Amino acid sequence: MAMSSLKSRVTLLLNWYTNPYHTPILVAQQLGFYSEEDIKLAILEPADPSDVTEIVGLGTVDFGVKAMIHTVAAKAKGYPVTSIGTLLDEPPTGLIALKSSGINSFQDIVGKRVGYIGEFGKKIIDDLASLAGIDPTSYKTVRIGMNVTDAIYRDVIDTGIGFINFQKVELEHLCGETVFLRIDQLAGLGCCCFCSIQFIVPEITLQQPELVKGFLRATQRGAAYTTEKPEEAYELLCQAKPQLRTPLYQKIFTRTLPFFSRTLINVDRDWDKVGRYTKHLKIIDEHFDISQCYTNRFLPDTPYSDLKPIACCLEN
């Protein structure tokens, strides 16, 4: 068969290994929603999660998944990436530790090993320590990537940054009672938007509006199905990835349900707060325009419906 006769695939690079917070994507794939949009989607996992924004920015893949703060940083570095929608809205993020560690407040990091995911995690920890009057030489920061739970379990660190609906659940499952110190509360942000998980695209994908609109229509249907029929959605996830059929992952799925975005909308308020916070952390400069990081123009005007409307009651 000639290569030209093969239907081209559309690529989506996840931010980590496939897990319950990717459920809307897997549901849309399993139920054929992407196929109905004439999208043959190849879902890829990164060998190193820190490579995702660069790979997307270079146009090597069509779509990617990444946290809001990393999307802002990538744009500031010159990578042409844009958020076209939201997968997870404000999953609470914070320092996780075992209760037996003796860490009950942020001041208790003195003399401890503090794990962080990437360069911005260290900036956040050091900034909070500075504001709290903690000597930066009195604690040790350790880059451990996304595997916070394993690092605590192996006694590599005493505490580390993670999601309340994921790493905290993992650590409780492995080791028992935990402590969770929310970063948004420590930093007075009023929301945990900096770790919202976004769908990001390179410039070349933005130039294909029908592809982007079709991807978002299908994904929005997957998100609606996930929140409306969680038991069926989890079953579809497990059919796609049988290794996720465990009590632990089922609990992570249940804890993640409140944070799935049904509309996929980029929330202006959240981007504004993240813009101000990243300026405070000196990740971006004062002249950086946060509005260039995201767009809602490709999202459906109304959610998908199996029912044909009797009339449009909003018309004049």
Curated annotation (Swiss-Prot):
Disruption phenotype: Growth auxotrophic for thiamine; growth partially restored by hydroxymethylpyrimidine (HMP). SUPFAM superfamilies: Periplasmic binding protein-like II. Its EC number is 2.-.-.-. The modification N6-(pyridoxal phosphate)lysine is found at residue 66. A motif (CCCFC) lies at residues 191-195. GO terms for molecular function: 4-amino-5-hydroxymethyl-2-methylpyrimidine phosphate synthase activity from histidine and PLP; metal ion binding; vitamin B6 binding. Pathway: Cofactor biosynthesis; thiamine diphosphate biosynthesis. Keywords: Iron, Metal-binding, Pyridoxal phosphate, Thiamine biosynthesis, Transferase. Its cofactor is Fe cation. Transmembrane segments: none annotated. Changing residue 70 to A: Decreases pyridoxal phosphate (PLP) binding. One of its GO terms (biological process) is thiamine diphosphate biosynthetic process. Gene3D superfamilies: Periplasmic binding protein-like II. InterPro entries: NMT1/THI5, SsuA/THI5. Pyridoxal 5'-phosphate binds at residues 118-121. The active site is at residue 70. Changing residue 119 to A: Decreases catalytic activity. It catalyses: N(6)-(pyridoxal phosphate)-L-lysyl-[4-amino-5-hydroxymethyl-2-methylpyrimidine phosphate synthase] + L-histidyl-[4-amino-5-hydroxymethyl-2-methylpyrimidine phosphate synthase] + 2 Fe(3+) + 4 H2O = L-lysyl-[4-amino-5-hydroxymethyl-2-methylpyrimidine phosphate synthase] + (2S)-2-amino-5-hydroxy-4-oxopentanoyl-[4-amino-5-hydroxymethyl-2-methylpyrimidine phosphate synthase] + 4-amino-2-methyl-5-(phosphooxymethyl)pyrimidine + 3-oxopropanoate + 2 Fe(2+) + 2 H(+). Responsible for the formation of the pyrimidine heterocycle in the thiamine biosynthesis pathway. Catalyzes the formation of hydroxymethylpyrimidine phosphate (HMP-P) from histidine and pyridoxal phosphate (PLP). The protein uses PLP and the active site histidine to form HMP-P, generating an inactive enzyme. The enzyme can only undergo a single turnover, which suggests it is a suicide enzyme. Homodimer. Belongs to the NMT1/THI5 family. This is 4-amino-5-hydroxymethyl-2-methylpyrimidine phosphate synthase. The lineage of its organism: Bacteria, Pseudomonadati, Pseudomonadota, Gammaproteobacteria, Legionellales.
